[in-house]
Amino acid sequence: MKAAVYCFGRFQPPTIGHAKVFDAVARAARTYNADAYMFASQSHKKTKFDNKSCNPLLYDMKMDYLKKMFPQYASNFVVDKSVVTFLHAATWLYMKDYTHLYMVAGSDRVGSYTEKLNQYNCQPDKSGEIIFCFRSIEVISAGTRDPDADGAQGMSGTKMRKAAQDLETTAFMSGIPNTLSIDQKLELMHDVRAGLVLPKENK
């Protein structure tokens, strides 16, 4: 048995809340004697802070921040531009000869990820190709997020993008782990703002 545990997320921007997901990946890896991998979306689109397609940070920039913010997992982050979706990540792991796959996701996404991964497991895709064929697949919940809670439990990318837009420096920096210096936190806020369509009053 050769097992892998992975997560896939937007991380726009990375926050203290994402530690919950990464920690869950690490725990699952220990539980199942598996290797841990963390993938990030490459999506980048300059829109308003609350747009669902808002992805202000470029991929390479985001991966650099992730490694600095979560140095304990720096070796687990995968930087590979051939991996665009969570299905590509599964294929990437299958090509590494893993036979058992575990994915960690938010509680609200467990069902949809389970359905999609099983839909393609050992089954041809639209082009007739089998992109992966694991002996077993399981999607594990990283827990729920309470948007009204303080700290990591209630942190979200939307809150962080709004704080960056409104130049709410204290609020923005409170959502970033202290593995970044104050100057680095301010630089991240600047980079997020640069990737947003800002209202005239916030420019």
Would you name each region that the model predicts?
Residues 1-203:
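Nucleotidyltransferase catalytic core that binds NTPs
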